[in-house]
Amino acid sequence: IEILTGDFISEVDENSVYLGEESMPYDVLVWAGGITGREPAANSDLAKDERSKRLHAESNFQTSDDRVFAIGDAALIDQGGDEQAPPTAEAAWTAAEVAGENLVRALRGAPLKSWQHTDKGTAVSVGEDAVAHDVMGIPVNTFGGLAARTLKKAIAARWIAEVSSPKRAISAWSDM
């Protein structure tokens, strides 16, 4: 399994996927791309990516209009240089706390905090199977099987515990 991120797919045929001028053969292609900005944002006067219509935001979530904040997969959040935060649930989850604080800070006229995404790796599940890649603190680059399935469940349980309660996360474990 090879996971590629950050490249625009220009074409797909029955044998190959094309990333710009380069082609790569595939047996099974799972394409999870296509994230675009919402129509109201696309039609706004805010600075946005012309291709995806996602809003450009500074690391404090402010857009070209300092009264408008953007977060999650609706935004290209500056991470320094030419880098933007990935449009993942993990990034949105960690960004949300700082973005929420910044809304309050903006209302009070206080300085805004910057946010920097820390990539902790990727865990993907398809049906009963899972694969994990580049997971922080684990010396193996890519792995699957029981370890990846357990990691994926633990990520979901952590989220449930955070938004609900640890008791609910424990009771949901067997259904994940």
Regions found by a protein language model. Give the residues of each.
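Internal hydrophobic alpha-helix adjacent to the cofactor/substrate pocket in enzyme cavities
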Residues: 90-117
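A conserved short coil-to-beta-strand element within the FAD-binding core of flavoproteins
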Residues: 5-16
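FAD-site-proximal beta/loop scaffold in flavoenzymes
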Residues: 15-94
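General small-molecule cofactor/ligand-binding pocket signal
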Residues: 2-4, 69
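C-terminal auxiliary extensions adjacent to catalytic cores
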Residues: 128-176
